[in-house]
From Swiss-Prot:
Organism taxonomic ancestry: Eukaryota, Metazoa, Spiralia, Lophotrochozoa, Platyhelminthes
UniProt keyword Protein biosynthesis, yes or no: no
Protein name per the record: Cathepsin L2
Function description: Thiol protease that assists the parasite in burrowing through the gut wall and liver of its mammalian host.
Catalytic activity: Specificity close to that of papain. As compared to cathepsin B, cathepsin L exhibits higher activity toward protein substrates, but has little activity on Z-Arg-Arg-NHMec, and no peptidyl-dipeptidase activity
Amino acid sequence: AVPDKIDRRESGYV
C-alpha cells in the first residue's frame, strides 16, 4: 500500500 496515514501499517511507514 501507499505510506499514508492509514496504509502506513501495510507499507511499514511508521
